Amino acid sequence: MRMSKLYMPTLREVPSEAELPSHQLLLRAGMIRKLVAGVYSYLPLGYRTLKKVEQIVREEMDRAGAQEALMSALQPKELWEATGRWQAIGPEMMRLKDRHNREFCLGPTHEEVITDLVKNELKSYKQLPLNLYQIQTKYRDEKRPRFGLMRSREFIMKDAYSFDKDEEGMKKSYEDMWKGYERVFDRCELKYKVVEGDAGAMGDSESHEFMAMSQYGESLVAYCDHCDYAATDEKATVVYDVTEKDEGLLETEKIHTPNTKTIEALTMLFDCDANHFIKTLLFEAGEKVVAVSIPGDRDVNETKLVNMLNIPGHELVMASEATVKRVTGAEVGFAGPMNLKGEVKLYVDARVSKMKNVVVGANETDYHIKNVNYGRDFEGELVEDLLLVQEGDLCPTCGETLKLDRGIEVGNIFQLDMKYSKGLNATFLDENGKEQYFYMGSYGIGIGRTMAAVIEQYHDEKGIKWPLALAPYQVVVTIVNPNKDEQRELGEKIYSKLLSKGVEVLLDDRKESPGVKFKDAELIGIPIRVVAGKNAGENIVEFALRATDEKKEVEADEVVEMVMDQLKGL
């Protein structure tokens, strides 16, 4: 491709709305452009890389035994009502009505559609296992779309669905897809961790997420260096023991604490650590109000709370000031577990029951109570773990110290059991002629997210450093001055030879300054650069690798072979 013909509107300045390096560089490199918030168009260079990610995914899904199909993005409400997800997913679902007032959604995922499709066609255990996948545009009405391709309202996704006759078969399909995902992300040269994840609205069975590690990741990952334990902060089991005081139970005492509404302020007033307090938080869970009491130095894990309450995630919100005042009789900041109004259900993290003579909110503005003890002064429903993991917590597998790092979720896999087959009455006949529900799995890869995650891991101050397998073009041949015959002719000759060998190559024949050409090549991240410049008359070119910034002058007759050596193994 001649760059004089290429549509590549590069930018020198960083767009003000772009926060992450991947978003900045995709815009600056002329690979994407925003239509509206959370909706992007792929330009030629970006689309070439997108198709390469898709092709890697396609090859590995085929290798894992999945078959490609394509389903409708427009889905009827009735299917989602049958599984209970029309209400559960909440405002993130893009909903619409046709001219006959029938309700639809633009699919964020396709469990309902694929189950409805298969149940009408697949009748016997002899047709199992089956795994179908598609690569398709999905929709999610993000409250705050940001970070470019990382959190958008329209995104391209590979979603696969497996059908098996029993749990053993489902687990085998799950394992096969896990291995397929590892091959996908290995070929994309991503540094990633496989972590336990929360299934959320997908179901309550086992799930794992593939996290590309990045300081800009939206997810927090807890992991252990001493064993293979790794989980999202939403899923991580918190091993945290309260040090019990070696003292008797003291008499409670109400203390005047004016304008002392935070744990930090309380620690200063009482001159003690945060673990001497019990923190009580109030939530609105649908139409109910719930209170949660936890150690003062910890945070509530809202995902664990949602799962325990068995409600859609969007229904859990922090209680409003008006609600707090109604159920505690106090302003925000003074809630405690004692004497809450009858309508409030109190849940207590189990660690609280071991804490002695602690300070709690008095449910009275500007007052706290000290020397409070669970069992004597208040009771609630004890819950084993309602805490959010913190750095330094102990690994639930081996007991060593956990570390926290950030990651970008690029893939996920779920064991769905019979959630969707039961909801949609999808059955087959087993060996004994008896009707059974399908055991299912669901498997997603964010295509655009993977592309952005690669940039997060492979870039510098000059631009992108694409791995060879994903680069929009593998080589750029730069003619420094097209007006000089020896440079133009040598560049054209090398370009033609590379094309004849099937190399994906750009020829920078633009009438731009050398600086512009070099900066553009570095910005768009072409892995190999061949420069026909001042020494072209002596049959000498510059050979440069973007990954290492290594440059050297070589004989022009050798450069094609050098390029082919770099491309071996692709």
Swiss-Prot record:
Gene Ontology BP terms: prolyl-tRNA aminoacylation
Gene Ontology molecular-function annotations: aminoacyl-tRNA deacylase activity; ATP binding; catalytic activity, acting on a protein; proline-tRNA ligase activity; transferase activity
Keywords attached to this entry: Aminoacyl-tRNA synthetase, ATP-binding, Cytoplasm, Ligase, Nucleotide-binding, Protein biosynthesis
Listed Pfam families: HGTP_anticodon, tRNA-synt_2b, tRNA_edit
Principal location listed in the UniProt entry: cytoplasm
A GO CC term attached to the entry: cytosol
InterPro entries: aa-tRNA-synt_IIb (IPR002314), aa-tRNA-synth_II (IPR006195), aa-tRNA-synth_II/BPL/LPL (IPR045864), Anticodon-bd (IPR004154), Anticodon-bd_dom_sf (IPR036621), Pro-tRNA-ligase_IIa (IPR002316), Pro-tRNA-synth_IIa_bac-type (IPR004500), Pro-tRNA-Synthase_IIa_type1 (IPR023717)
Statement: the UniProt record of this protein carries the keyword Zinc: no
Claim: Kinase is one of the keywords in the record: no
Superkingdom per UniProt: Bacteria
Catalysis: reaction(s): tRNA(Pro) + L-proline + ATP = L-prolyl-tRNA(Pro) + AMP + diphosphate
UniProt EC number: 6.1.1.15
Job description of the protein: Catalyzes the attachment of proline to tRNA(Pro) in a two-step reaction: proline is first activated by ATP to form Pro-AMP and then transferred to the acceptor end of tRNA(Pro). As ProRS can inadvertently accommodate and process non-cognate amino acids such as alanine and cysteine, to avoid such errors it has two additional distinct editing activities against alanine. One activity is designated as 'pretransfer' editing and involves the tRNA(Pro)-independent hydrolysis of activated Ala-AMP.
Domain free text: Consists of three domains: the N-terminal catalytic domain, the editing domain and the C-terminal anticodon-binding domain.
Assembly behavior: Homodimer.
UniProt similarity note: Belongs to the class-II aminoacyl-tRNA synthetase family. ProS type 1 subfamily.
Protein name: Proline--tRNA ligase
